A protein has these predicted regions:
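Membrane-embedded alpha-helical hairpins and interfacial helices in multi-pass inner-membrane proteins
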Residues: 38-47, 76-97, 102-198
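Short, charged juxtamembrane terminal tails flanking transmembrane helices
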Residues: 2-17, 186-198
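Short linear sequence motifs
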Residues: 1, 12, 23, 156-158, ...
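Juxtamembrane loop-helix boundary motifs flanking transmembrane segments in multi-pass membrane proteins
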Residues: 8-16, 72, 156-160, 164
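Hydrophobic transmembrane alpha-helices
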Residues: 8-69
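Short, functional N-terminal and low-complexity linear motifs
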Residues: 21-27, 70, 102, 150-155
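Small-polar-interrupted transmembrane alpha-helices in polytopic inner-membrane proteins
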Residues: 30, 71-79
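Non-catalytic, surface-exposed connector residues within folded enzymatic/regulatory domains
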Residues: 70-71, 179
Length: 198
């Protein structure tokens, strides 16, 4: 039987005020952590090779459904802030829309697969690795990059090689952060009994 949208997103599983409060805290933490990562790691927080340390927080989607809107809104805030700070203008909207969609998809799948945490958190790796590289060549060309970073492959007419490079590089960066930082965080949250029962 198909449930309602509210049960699909876990709203029915906890009091509404708690759900909204958790989502707000998660959004604020994710946005702040992403902006701090941007300031400290600069180019490694955005682009074809990413180590967005804040992605470690995505694992909370395995313990609370409030992470679905929380991470999505946090990602929107961080990507809008990056668009303003970096001056990407309208091109930055690609990241706001599609990068946030990748986070949303990863969060929904992670929540749905939460009984298998190691697989569940991998949903963020898959979503980001498949979606972000699809618009990255357009964004990079608009910012004045004409070759695939770290190679001599021209972006012009090389969409498929650029996409494949992005799948690998974005996937590796996401996997390192999710599994090296996020999985221990998830384990610690569960041990500290911070995770609500699901």
């Amino acid at each position: 039987m198909v449930g309602t949208a509210s049960s699909f997103f876990g709203v029915a599983e906890m009091p509404r005020t708690r759900y909204i409060a958790q989502a707000g805290v998660i959004a604020a933490l994710y946005a702040a952590a992403t902006l701090i990562t941007m300031m400290l790691l600069q180019g490694l927080a955005w682009g074809p090779v990413q180590f967005r340390i804040s992605e470690a927080l995505c694992v909370v989607a395995a313990i609370t459904p409030a992470a679905i809107p929380g991470l999505t809104v946090g990602c929107v805030i961080a990507n809008v802030a990056n668009m303003v700070i970096s001056g990407t203008g309208a091109l930055g909207m690609l990241d706001v829309v599609f990068g946030s969609a990748a986070t949303f998809i990863g969060a929904v799948l992670c929540w749905r697969l939460r009984k298998r945490p190691a697989i569940a958190i991998g949903c963020f790796v898959a979503a980001n690795a498949l979606i972000v590289p699809a618009y990255l060549p357009i964004l990079l060309q608009g910012l004045g990059f004409y070759t695939i970073p770290f190679t001599d492959i021209s972006i012009d007419g090389a969409y498929l090689p650029m996409y494949l490079f992005g799948v690998i590089s974005t996937g590796i960066g996401e996997a390192v952060v999710i599994y090296a930082l996020g999985l221990p965080l998830l384990t610690a949250l569960k041990r500290a009994n911070i995770a609500p029962s699901s």
